[in-house]
Amino acid sequence: MKVLPDRPRLFRVVVALGVMALAAACGSNSPGSAGTTASPAASAASGVDLEQGTATVMNAQETVLTSPDGFTLYYLTVDTAAAPKCTGACLSTWPPLLTNGNPSSMVPLSGTLTVAMNANGDQVAYNGHLLYRYAGDKAKGDAKGEGLQAFGGVWKVATPALTVAG
């Protein structure tokens, strides 16, 4: 007597293997894979965790707020959470720190972290100051954006001691 394979079972196994292969291919981020990736600075992270680091600011080491990837954060002196001045072309030089959840800090902060829903997206603010990265900072500890005048105001390094906007 010849035993034939259980066709419905074989079909389910083949379908399951195909689904797993497809899922693995979609999750791949290897070179040559399709899809686009956003810059870490401009991408939204779920529940951003701010950190502190040190940066050379005006020839002195200073404690600064940093993005989850360790880069110095800044604020624009004329920005408001409801109506940011840094929009459009500004965002390519000063990408906003965006979030998909509640921001928090990996270290104790005396101020308040909030999310401002504005034209830039759900942007993280510290003590009412919208936070940005500077595209000119190429390494952790850089603070090359400090004191730059652009987009109607002065760019300042965000520190844990940053006072409430007002």
Report each predicted region and the residues it spans.
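Short, low-complexity cationic-aromatic patches
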Residues: 53-71, 116-129, 166
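C-terminal motif of bacterial Sec signal peptides marking the signal peptidase cleavage site
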Residues: 21-25
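Bacterial N-terminal signal peptides that target proteins for export
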Residues: 2-14
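N-terminal low-complexity, Pro/Thr/Ser-rich intrinsically disordered segments
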Residues: 35-58
